[in-house]
Amino acid sequence: MKLVSVALMYLGSLAFLGADTARLDVASEFRKKWNKWALSRGKRELRMSSSYPTGLADVKAGPAQTLIRPQDMKGASRSPEDSSPDAARIRVKRYRQSMNNFQGLRSFGCRFGTCTVQKLAHQIYQFTDKDKDNVAPRSKISPQGYGRRRRRSLPEAGPGRTLVSSKPQAHGAPAPPSGSAPHFL
């Protein structure tokens, strides 16, 4: 029984290490995937480029009537001026511009996750800030609250505080009148 368990342990480790040390040809796998991707992209670009002209030379060389279908024409007039090469060129230009603008809802600016979080936080702040009023609560305005009014209503100088005036004083000069605002350190 002991021999069987040792043999199983030996075979298991051999199989594990053998599979671990077997070299995979990563470069050839990558090359295969790359070639497949490049081939499919080339086919897609070939189909797209043959569906509509890409430049002015293609418009002059190719037939212009294929770009304007009778369904696309507005109005009942079917004059020969509407299907002229100039009209077709304008039509192609508008078509290309609309396709470039429609390629997904492009968002300009930062595309990182942190920027998205900051934008969302800013929007939340804007939405919630409109209901707030700019007046402090009465409990904060009172003499027991915080702010300028409390500092004004405090007693002049307590035993643990020192008064410092905003104006420099000479030695032996009298203290400033009680009407001026003292500064505490």
UniProtKB/Swiss-Prot annotation:
Residues 45-92, 148-185 form a propeptide. Residues 60-87, 133-185 are annotated as: Disordered. It comes from the Eukaryota. Keywords: Amidation, Cleavage on pair of basic residues, Disulfide bond, Hormone, Secreted, Signal. This is Pro-adrenomedullin. Highest levels found in pheochromocytoma and adrenal medulla. Also found in lung, ventricle and kidney tissues. The keyword Disulfide bond applies. Numerous actions have been reported most related to the physiologic control of fluid and electrolyte homeostasis. In the kidney, ADM is diuretic and natriuretic, and both ADM and PAMP inhibit aldosterone secretion by direct adrenal actions. In pituitary gland, both peptides at physiologically relevant doses inhibit basal ACTH secretion. InterPro entries: Adrenomedullin-reg_peptide (IPR051665), Calcitonin/adrenomedullin (IPR021116), Pro-ADM (IPR001710). Residues 1-21 form the signal peptide. One of its GO terms (biological process) is neural tube closure. Pfam families: Calc_CGRP_IAPP. The keyword DNA-binding does not apply. One of its GO terms (molecular function) is hormone activity. It is found in: Secreted. One of its GO terms (cellular component) is extracellular region.
